[in-house]
Every structure is written in C-alpha cells, then in structure tokens.
C-alpha cells in the first residue's frame, strides 16, 4: 500500500510538471492577477481585527489591546447607534432603487443593438454610450452641477415654459433621481458589452427554427434571445446583489449638501467621516465589517434562490 501511494504521488507530480511545462505562459499570465489579489485583497484582511481592538496608531494593529466586552465594544456601538441605522436605511433604499432601474437598462440596450442591421450606426451608438464610462466622477458631478443649478440649462428651459425653477441640487427629493440617472448615463453602455457578448454566442439555428414556426421579431426575442442570455443575466444579478451595500462615496460626497444629507448620507460616507475625519478607526472598521457581512448575506440568499429555481448559480 505504501508503494502504491508513493507511485500515485510520483505520477501526480510528473503530471503537474508536464502540465506546467506545457502551459507555462498561461500560468505566468495568471500569476499577475494572483499576486494582485493576494497583496491588495487578502493580505489587508487582517485589518478586520481593528473592529475588535482599542486601536492606537503608535502600537499598530497587532500591538493594540483588545476592546472591552470581549472585543465587542465597537460592534455593540454600531448596533446601538441610531444614526447608523439611518445611513443603513439610506444605503438600502438608494441601492435597491438603483438596481431596479439600472440593471435592466444595459439588457434592453443590448437587445436593441442586437436588432440593428446597419453595422456603422451600431458602432456609433456603442461608442457614444461607452464614452461616459471613462469620465471621472468629478467631471460627471461637475456637469450635473452646471446643468441643474439655478442658472443651468435645465432651469432655463423650465423658466422659459413659465414654471418655477427647481432647486435640484439642494432638494432632498431630487437627490436619488439625479444619482440614479447619472449612473445609468455613465454605466449603461459599458455594461452592455457583457450582454452583447452573450448574444453573439447564441445559436443562429434557433432563430431559423423560430422563423419556420412563424415567430416574428418579438416572439424570437421572448422565446430565443432572452432564454439564451438568461444565465448571464442571473450571474450579473447575483454579483449586483453583492454590491447592494456598496455606494461610490466619491459621487455621494460631491453631491451631498446640508439640505439633502438626510437621504444622501450612506454607509460609505459615514465610514469616511468616522474613520478619516474623526480618526475613529475601530468604529469605522466595525461598520465596514457589518456592511460586508450583509453583502455576503445578500449574495448567498440570491445564489441559493437562483440554484433552487434555475440551473445557474455562482456555487
């Protein structure tokens, strides 16, 4: 038995060496992202212990003493903080509204582009919709401020129609529509790439069979196109649910004013203020840890539902 086990071990070793020699360039390509994730994603995870420590910069993370209540001091503070639940609610509402509106947009655009027969027009539309993705958040918010301020083009049009000007930038009720609208404009074209790629892999014989059965464009879309890209849609939805607790704090900070803070203050901006501005690192880490656990819960539940109702899931 010992000889058999040793022989199997040698066989596995030889196969690994041969596979490595055969695909050495692929392994080399894989090495760079592997190193990136180890250094910038996994290695910093030890910083999560800040949530359970009385952090002192002079002592560092490892040298700082554990917090009171068996290390749960800051976790309990987060749970008992009424304002945390306010920003938690703002984050959930903003991201759910954003998901409901922005998630279908690239799918619809991809389906529309897929029906365009004129190749040049299709490329122009794709280029125009891709470009906003490459604009920085500062530029996008600056454009919004120029367009929607009291003397901007939008209020000029409203005034020319005999209506009162609207304070878009400071009125809390307009914050979410402006945030979501800018997200659609900035991301819809780029997100379309994934769905266009999925559409390009569909079997054209299915469309031919649908035409023979008398299906028009609409029925082909309903019964061939959408079912064909449904696995991609499900995977993208699961990944989107994992980001439901994450909001780009750069855009929020740039759009936030004293009058709209009641709806614009979210977890990421709250963590920024407590961690960076007030140097309350342990509390900010505890908030971030709670945020990550909720995101994991959303992904797990969505993946479980997907696995039970379809054959597509992340794991």
What are the functions of these language-model segments?
Residues 19-315:
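A structural signal for multi-pass alpha-helical bundles of membrane permease subunits
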Residues 1-19:
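Short, Lys/Arg-rich, polar N-terminal cytosolic tail immediately upstream
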């Amino acid at each position: 038995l010992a000889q058999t086990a040793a022989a199997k071990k040698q066989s596995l070793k030889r196969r690994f060496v041969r596979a490595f020699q055969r695909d050495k360039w692929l392994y080399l390509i894989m090495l760079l992202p592997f190193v990136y994730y180890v250094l910038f994603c996994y290695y910093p995870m030890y910083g999560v212990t800040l949530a359970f420590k009385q952090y002192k910069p002079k002592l560092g993370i490892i040298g700082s003493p554990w917090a009171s209540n068996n290390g749960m001091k800051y976790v309990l503070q987060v749970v008992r903080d009424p304002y945390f639940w306010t920003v938690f609610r703002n984050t959930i509402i903003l991201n759910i509204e954003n998901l409901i509106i922005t998630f279908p947009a690239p799918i619809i655009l991809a389906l529309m582009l897929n029906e365009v027969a004129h190749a040049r027009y299709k490329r122009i539309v794709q280029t125009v919709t891709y470009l906003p993705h490459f604009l920085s958040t500062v530029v996008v918010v600056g454009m919004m401020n120029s367009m929607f301020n009291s003397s901007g083009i939008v209020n000029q049009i409203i005034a020319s129609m005999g209506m009162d000007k609207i304070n878009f930038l400071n009125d809390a009720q307009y914050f979410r529509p402006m945030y979501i609208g800018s997200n659609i404009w900035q991301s819809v074209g780029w997100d379309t790439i994934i769905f266009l790629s999925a559409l390009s892999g569909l079997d054209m014989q299915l469309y031919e069979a649908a035409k023979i059965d008398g299906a028009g464009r609409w029925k082909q879309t309903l019964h061939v196109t959408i079912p064909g890209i449904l696995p991609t849609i499900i995977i993208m939805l699961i990944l989107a649910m994992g980001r439901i607790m994450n909001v780009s704090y750069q855009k929020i900070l740039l759009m936030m004013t004293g009058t709209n803070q009641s709806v614009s203050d979210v977890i990421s901006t709250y963590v920024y203020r407590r961690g960076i501005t007030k140097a309350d690192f342990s509390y900010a880490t505890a908030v971030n840890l709670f945020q990550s656990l909720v995101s994991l819960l959303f992904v797990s539940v969505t993946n479980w539902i997907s696995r039970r109702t379809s054959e597509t899931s992340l794991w």
